[in-house]
Structure formats: C-alpha cells, structure tokens
Amino acid sequence: MNTIYSKHHFLVSVIVGLLLGISVTDSALLIFVTALYAGIIGVIIDIDHFAISRLHSGDWSAAKNCLRFPVQSLIYQEDIFGEEEVEPAERVLSHLLISGVVVPVIWVFTPRWSFVTGVVLYVHILTNAYADASGYFD
C-alpha cells in the first residue's frame, strides 16, 4: 500500500494555510497563525488511524508504542501499524465522517476557522487518495 506520512501532510497543509492566509489578510501574524493551524489540523486528523488499527488488531499497541517512543514514531512512521491494520477505504471514510462533524461544529463558533479547517481536511483527503492511487510519495 502506498501512503503519505505526517511530514507530507504537514507541509501540504502549511502551504494551504499560507495561501488561505495571504488571500484574506496582510497581517504576517495572522498568516503565520493560519499556516500553523492548518499544519496541525492536517496532521491531527490522522489520529483516527489508531482507532482503526485497534479495530483490526484488538489492542492499542500502535498508540502505546507511539506514546512510549514519540521520536521514533515520527522518524519510522512506516513501522507504526501492522500490515493491513489501516485500510485506505476505512481511512478515507473515517476522515470524511470526522470532517463532516468537525467543520460544522467549528462553524457555529467561528466560520473563518471552519472554512480553513474544511479546506485543509479536503486537501488532506485528496493527498491520501492521490498517494493511494499513484505511489508518488513512496
């Protein structure tokens, strides 16, 4: 299975955040905050992979190992999950379900950040689909 890792999602999300920030403000601080927020959202959505892995493996070993060895988890991401613990279709479905809840909830409090969140999550799902289809990020 081809995959895209956190470093790729972070970079793509920061670029999206920069473009969104630049398009609506001249404030360097707000552009920076938007890019940072986008980077965080673009990576944090993948926390659902641990729940999917738990469903397949029957335990939380992937999450426990990442908490025990966080630096290794960032460097050797390909070793976090066992083979076929996180299937592409499940990952995409989970991301769509989370996005469909998170974006409207944020909209209630702040439409601007809801828009940023929605765009970043959309791009996240697109990059996953592209990586799954092409193997470009391997």
Ranges and model annotations:
Residues 1-138:
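N-terminal membrane-targeting hydrophobic helices
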